[in-house]
Amino acid sequence: MGKSFANFMCKKDFHPASKSNIKKVWMAEQKISYDKKKQEELMQQYLKEQESYDNRLLMGDERVKNGLNFMYEAPPGAKKENKEKEETEGETEYKFEWQKGAPREKYAKDDMNIRDQPFGIQVRNVRCIKCHKWGHVNTDRECPLFGLSGINASSVPTDGSGPSMHPSELIAEMRNSGFALKRNVLGRNLTANDPSQEYVASEGEEDPEVEFLKSLTTKQKQKLLRKLDRLEKKKKKKDRKKKKFQKSRSKHKKHKSSSSSSSSSSSSSSTETSESSSESESNNKEKKIQRKKRKKNKCSGHNNSDSEEKDKSKKRKLHEELSSSHHNREKAKEKPRFLKHESSREDSKWSHSDSDKKSRTHKHSPEKRGSERKEGSSRSHGREERSRRSRSRSPGSYKQRETRKRAQRNPGEEQSRRNDSRSHGTDLYRGEKMYREHPGGTHTKVTQRE
């Protein structure tokens, strides 16, 4: 589907793009170029002959003068044909074996670069590195040296015509042909001509230790084995002791670190727990020291340990007594402060009441005092109740109710209420500036606020 017209026409015999016509054109071009080369060679030969003839005439050769030189010289094309035959006889190397007896056209006889494609034969234009033959690679099983290293391949007998299989020469040929080995194979500072690359056979030299062991008898060998076993056991014991000592050290360090971390956490949580933990740690340390001393001096150290314990118990008791006395002193200091504060509050109350009484006695006569006291007490009770109710309500509603009640009252009561409010204001003003002296010599400022 969809093939072009050119693809259809190139299959015709008369079309110039057909394969047969292209081949014919190429063959004709090759013949023309071959003929041109022959003519050029003949012209060069003729020029050389003319030069040699002229030189002989100058030298004075008699044969040239007589004109008999042509009798002793071969025809112009005979020398070249003989040389080509000698070269072809000497050259036995072919890329492939089937090329030795295969017929070839004249223009392709001398040119080895032309690749032949015979019918029914697989042609691989590849050369082996090991055997240097065409048609396979060193990894193919066709190669006669397959599976052999360079050193082993060099030892294999050959006809002598092939190249040597030494690794240094193989590496050089690989480089010339464009291949190269990795550095991991040769090494960084290794070269192909390095003597370490050559195979060196062992000369049968033995170590002095092996000779000494061979010279010993069976009994001496048994003794040596026993000694070696003992030394190995001693080494193992030493290693075990070292490991145990290291483990005990690591455990001791871990215990210390855990105790220090626990003490730091307790101190951060509360000061009381830190004190108790520090005391317990100190007690533990002291007990450890005492145990060590007891182990060292079991017989002589009993009395000393008892005296030390007594001294420590005395020190603890003194410490507890000092802490309790300090606590009692702080309580005793706090009590008078509280009493002074309460007494100052009571004095302020008494001074306020006295100032109210004095202001009322100065302003009013003794006849009106009884009536005013009764009215004041009743009014104070009413005010307290109103203030309690007004706290829960809004201030706007409270003011409106007071104005309505004032309008309902009598004018005589309003005048008496105004007089009471004036007298009360003066009493407040005086009460704010009054001072009272206490027996201790301290002055307290009395203030009254409603």
Curated annotation (Swiss-Prot):
Entry keywords, A to Z: Cytoplasm, Cytoskeleton, Isopeptide bond, mRNA processing, mRNA splicing, Nucleus, Phosphoprotein, Repressor, Transcription, Transcription regulation, Ubl conjugation
Is this entry keyworded Nucleus?
Answer: yes
Query: Where is this chain primarily localised?
Result: nucleus
Residues of the region (Interaction with RP9) are 204-232
**Tissue expression summary:** Highly expressed in heart, brain, placenta, liver, skeletal muscle and pancreas.
Q: Which SMART domains match?
A: Cir_N
Question: GO terms for CC?
Answer: centrosome; cytoplasm; nuclear speck; nucleus; protein-containing complex
Instruction: Tell me if Transcription is a UniProt keyword of this record.
Output: yes
Query: Where are stretches of biased composition, namely Basic residues?
Result: 233-257, 288-299
The biased composition feature labelled Low complexity covers 258-281
Note the position of the cross-link Glycyl lysine isopeptide (Lys-Gly) (interchain with G-Cter in SUMO2). K79, K340
Known function: May modulate splice site selection during alternative splicing of pre-mRNAs. Regulates transcription and acts as corepressor for RBPJ. Recruits RBPJ to the Sin3-histone deacetylase complex (HDAC). Required for RBPJ-mediated repression of transcription.
* Gene from which the chain derives: CIR1
Compositionally skewed regions (Basic and acidic residues) per UniProt: 78-93, 305-324, 331-358, 367-387, 411-440
Q: Where is this region: Disordered?
A: 72-93, 218-450
Q: What is this protein called?
A: Corepressor interacting with RBPJ 1
Q: Where does the record say this protein resides?
A: Nucleus speckle; Cytoplasm, Cytoskeleton, Microtubule organizing center, Centrosome
